[in-house]
Amino acid sequence: MAAKIRREDEVIVLAGKDKGKRGKVSRVLPTGKLIVEGINLIKKHQKPNPQMGVTGGIVEKEAPIQASNVAIFNSATGKADRVGFRFEDGKKVRFFKSNSELVK
């Protein structure tokens, strides 16, 4: 099955502590979760590891967010949108349901 949200897509958060924020998908996990830049930040207490050149301290990093809590952002309408699939010239392409434009 083709993925409705893919890497490099701009998404908007629909639910949770970061509701309303936008970000770019940096990674799609096989568990149905996404890692979005600047969204769902957590503080991780990092141990120093001189062999790997890692300094210790408190590090902020992005945690995975459930894919059902985000929607793809349609820049033409300025709102969250749904994605559909159709065939054009023998290729399967994604399009926005609200205005039928192709997802870039």
Curated annotation (Swiss-Prot):
Pfam entry (one): ribosomal_L24
Cellular component per GO, a single term: ribonucleoprotein complex
CDD domains assigned: KOW_RPL26 (cd06089)
Gene Ontology MF annotations: rRNA binding; structural constituent of ribosome
Annotated GO biological process: translation
InterPro entries cross-referenced by the UniProt entry: KOW (IPR005824), Rib_uL2_dom2 (IPR014722), Ribosomal_uL24 (IPR003256), Ribosomal_uL24_CS (IPR005825), Ribosomal_uL24_KOW (IPR041988), Translation_prot_SH3-like_sf (IPR008991)
Keyword tags: Ribonucleoprotein, Ribosomal protein, RNA-binding, rRNA-binding
Role of this protein: One of two assembly initiator proteins, it binds directly to the 5'-end of the 23S rRNA, where it nucleates assembly of the 50S subunit. One of the proteins that surrounds the polypeptide exit tunnel on the outside of the subunit.
NCBIfam families documented for this protein: rplX_bact
Family note: Belongs to the universal ribosomal protein uL24 family.
HAMAP family: Ribosomal_uL24_B (MF_01326_B)
Oligomer and partners: Part of the 50S ribosomal subunit.
Protein name: Large ribosomal subunit protein uL24
Organism lineage string: Bacteria, Pseudomonadati, Pseudomonadota, Gammaproteobacteria, Alteromonadales
Gene coding for it: rplX
